[in-house]
């Protein structure tokens, strides 16, 4: 089950710590009560710090990060930083393309996300994680799958983890 982090970009300091503590308790309790794996997605996050703060408070493997590559692309820090700081907690990926300004949900290859870099960072995780293509319908899915297979990204048409 995926939840948006809903962490406003201006949350820092004590406000961020309070938010992280409340959310960590909620997600942990929900995951354990219902036997769920919960993934918290970077949604409005301009950098990984809100999710890092959240995961400093979480001690269960039932709560993970859903890293949305498209959202990370238009954030204020490089994709490498998202993987470096959250990699051990990543349990799910959302894939869509954009031109670096806002969330366009374009088919992969139609924006300017560096998919070779994203694939390399995914491989460095050393484990496979579920992925969702958020690309606006069956045509976008077909275009994205063709793109992934042509380049051998994320284990399609090439080597797998």
Which residues does each PLM region occupy?
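Histidine-acidic metal/acid-base catalytic patches
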Residues: 29, 48-67, 72-161
């Amino acid at each position: 089950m995926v939840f948006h982090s809903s962490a406003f970009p201006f949350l820092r300091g004590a406000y961020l710590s309070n938010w992280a503590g409340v959310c960590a308790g909620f997600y942990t309790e929900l995951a354990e009560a219902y036997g769920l794996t919960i993934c918290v997605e970077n949604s409005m996050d301009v950098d990984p710090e809100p999710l890092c703060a959240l995961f400093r408070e979480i001690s269960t493997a039932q709560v993970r990060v859903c890293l949305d590559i498209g959202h990370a692309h238009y954030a204020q820090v490089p994709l490498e930083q998202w993987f470096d700081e959250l990699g051990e907690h990543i349990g799910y990926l959302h894939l869509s393309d954009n031109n670096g300004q806002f969330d366009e949900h374009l088919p992969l290859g139609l924006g300017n996300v560096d998919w070779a870099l994203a694939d390399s960072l995914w491989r460095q995780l050393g484990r496979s994680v579920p992925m969702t293509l958020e690309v606006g319908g069956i045509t976008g899915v077909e275009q994205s799958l063709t793109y992934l297979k042509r380049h051998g990204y994320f284990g399609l048409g090439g080597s797998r983890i």
